[in-house]
Structures are given as structure tokens and as C-alpha cells.
Amino acid sequence: MNQLLNKIANIPFVWNTAQNIIGANQWKSSMYPSAVDAKEGTLLDFGCSSGNETAMFLSFDYYGIDVDAPAIEAAKKKFRAYSNVKFYTVDIIKEGFKKDFFDHVLFAGTAHHLSDAELGKVFRILLDNLKPGGQLHFIDPISQPEKDVWRTRFIIGADQGKNVRTEEVYRKFFSEQSVQVTQWKIFPNPYRFIRFPDFLYVRVIK
């Protein structure tokens, strides 16, 4: 039964509709552009899925990548009218991508789908994708045991990504990467009933 539900949830239209109903996409549409305050240049969206956040970055030369081929095909259809928007099915750990090419890399909402080993590998690869002086924008939900109410814990437990980490874990992770962190910010959940976990934003300069 769980496998069937997961397959249904992974259908791009179903997933996007669910995100709209519970307000997740609306929150991201205000959070992501406020974090990535630039308006132009080359931008890599790692783990773009079916392009749920792509519309926020149409002023960029936008590249979206994901391992999920059906989601990428859905994204291509959705944004086929935009010549500056491109999507690719890529396993970045196995294949890599454009090195020293991007002004911005968006690493958003995907880290909790990665194991610790995968997180380290992906982070270093994404840094390699940046031009010197480029910016990596890391955004991911965090677990806060001292704050999270049962509704938040339920959402975290129901998420397909099983590696929601604490802020302390990420502080240790980024300190071990020997990178220049220029911004560290918590985006609190804006809703009173649907208690999403708060999101951590970290800006890194290559």
C-alpha cells in the first residue's frame, strides 16, 4: 500500500497539486526569491522536479536538472515557450554537469532526500559548477526538537525525504566544507494550522 501511495505521490501533477493545496508552493514562491536576490545570470536549479519553482527565476538563463525523467519531461512541456529555460535528466553524482559555468546554484528542498555521504558529494559537485565568485543558495527544512509540535513532526515523518537534519548538524557540515558562508537565516513557517518545519537558508560564495 505504501509503495502504491508513493508512486501516486511521485506523479508530477499529483505532487504539484498537493503542494498547492497545503500552501507549500505559495510559501516557497515568497521564500526562494527573497533568498536569491539577484535577477539575472546563469542559474542551476538542482533537483528541480517538474519545475514547481522555475517560474520564480524566468529572468535568469535557467538550467533545471533532476534524476526523475518523467518530472523533467513535465517541466519541459510546462516551460516550452521560454528559450532561456532548459531542463536535463542528470544523475549529477555519476555524470557531473557544467563545471565553472553558473553564477548561481539553487540547492533547495533536496538535501533531506540525500544521505550524509551523498550530501557531501553533491555539495562539492555543485560548488564545482559555480564560476569563481558564484553563489550557492542552500535551502532545506530543519528539525527543531525543542520547538516542533506534533503536526510538524508528522509532516517531517510523512516526507519522502528521510534525512531532515537539525540546524546544529548543518553548522557542523558547513564548517567542515571550508567554504565562505556569507548568510545564515531561518525562514519560519508562516502558517498557524499547517505546521511545516522551518527552513534553513545558507549562502555560500565560491
Describe the predicted segments one by one.
Residues 1-43, 48-96, 114-120, 137-206:
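Class I (Rossmann-like) S-adenosyl-L-methionine-dependent methyltransferase catalytic domain
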Residues 40, 102-103:
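Local beta-strand N-terminus motif with an aromatic residue
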Residues 106:
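A conserved beta-strand element that flanks and buttresses the S-adenosyl-L-methionine
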Residues 109-113:
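Short catalytic micro-motifs in class I SAM-dependent methyltransferases
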Residues 120-132:
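A short glycine-rich, Lys/Arg-flanked "PGG" loop and its adjoining helix->strand segment in the class I
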